[in-house]
Amino acid sequence: MKTLNEWFVEYGESHQNRTNKIIHKICVPLITWSLLGILWTIPVPEVFLSIGLNWAHVFLAFALTFYLSLKSMKVIGVFLLLAVPACVLFKVSWPIIGYKLFTSSVVVFVLAWIGQFIGHKIEGKKPSFFKDLQFLLIGPLWVFSDVISFNK
């Protein structure tokens, strides 16, 4: 299994251009939060409802498992920084705005991905996740690596 530093080095290969980096620092958190919003609104089996789970929670459990495999408490910090505010917001807003959470999340998700692809067009390199889907989980860590020192 790759170390966090190995993931960052490989991810960084297709993220050298200043404009692309700026676009990523805006779009990656938006994609993360909007994906959680979309997953939050997808109907779940009755057994999930009885214990208060939804598809966002399931996704976060898989993401956390991957992050734990990287053996870094700072990674867990980024996970919490991304997941906890989103879950609190969705839990509070879902009864109030309902389907609008889904619609607004889809709009943000699509626009943020368009931004990502524009960034990669400027960069002149394909997104890393074309090579390995796990890079979709590395992106948020890489974006926050400037804020939280990962001792790269």
Task: Put a short name on every predicted segment.
Residues 1-14, 18, 121-152:
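Membrane-proximal soluble regions of multi-pass membrane proteins
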Residues 2-53:
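Alpha-helical transmembrane segments and their cytosolic membrane-interface
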Residues 8-29, 63-75, 122, 149:
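Membrane interfacial helix-start motif at the N-side
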Residues 34-36, 58-66, 82-90:
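Hydrophobic, membrane-inserted alpha-helices
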Residues 36-54, 88-105:
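Helix-coil boundary and interhelical linker segments in multi-pass alpha-helical membrane proteins
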Residues 57-61, 76-80, 102-106:
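Hydrophobic alpha-helical transmembrane segments
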Residues 60-73, 108-124, 143-147:
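Transmembrane alpha-helical segments that form the membrane-embedded catalytic/substrate-channel core
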Residues 76-84, 131-133:
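Cytoplasmic-side transmembrane-helix entry/capping segments in multi-pass membrane proteins
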